[in-house]
C-alpha cells in the first residue's frame, strides 16, 4: 500500500519531447532577453497523476492519501501560461500526459 500526503497540489506537466521541441523553436525564433513558458498550461492534481500511473502500470493496490499536509515551500497551484511562445512560433504541446506516462512505464 502506498501512502501519500498533499494529494490536492496542482501542477503543470510537460513531456520531454514537447519541451525539447519548444526549446529548439525558442532558441531559433525567440527574442534575446525575453522569457518564455514551455508548459502544457493544463492543471493536473497529484491524485490524478497517481491514478494515471496506476492505470499504466496495471496496479490494483490502493493508494492511501493522508490529510492534506504541505510544507512552507509547497505551492498549492502552479500552472504555466504558454500563450507567448504559441504566439511567437505556434508551439503547443502535442503529447498528452497519459501518453507520456505510458511511454515512461514501457521503458521500465
Region spans (language model):
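Short, flexible, glycine-rich and Lys/Arg-enriched loop motifs at helix boundaries
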Residues: 1-7
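Glycine/proline-rich active-site loop of Rossmann-fold NAD(P)-dependent oxidoreductases
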Residues: 2, 16-18, 25-37, 42-45, ...
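C-terminal "lid/loop" region of Rossmann-like NAD(P)-dependent oxidoreductases
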Residues: 6, 35-36, 44-51, 58-77
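Residue-level signal for the nucleotide or nucleotide-sugar donor/cofactor binding architecture
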Residues: 8-17, 41-44, 73, 77-80, ...
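Generic structural signal for alpha-helix termini and adjacent loop/cap motifs
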Residues: 26-30, 88, 107
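Amphipathic terminal alpha-helices
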Residues: 83, 97-108
Amino acid at each position: 500500500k502506498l501512502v501519500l500526503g498533499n494529494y490536492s497540489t496542482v501542477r503543470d506537466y510537460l513531456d520531454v519531447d514537447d519541451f525539447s521541441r519548444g526549446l529548439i523553436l525558442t532558441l531559433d525564433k525567440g527574442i534575446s532577453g525575453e522569457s518564455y513558458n514551455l508548459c502544457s498550461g493544463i492543471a493536473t492534481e497529484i491524485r490524478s497523476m497517481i491514478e494515471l500511473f496506476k492505470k499504466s502500470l496495471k496496479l490494483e493496490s490502493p493508494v492511501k492519501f493522508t490529510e492534506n499536509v504541505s510544507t512552507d515551500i509547497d505551492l498549492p497551484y502552479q500552472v504555466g501560461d504558454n500563450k507567448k511562445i504559441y504566439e511567437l512560433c505556434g508551439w503547443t504541446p502535442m503529447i498528452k500526459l497519459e501518453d507520456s506516462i505510458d511511454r515512461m512505464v514501457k521503458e521500465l
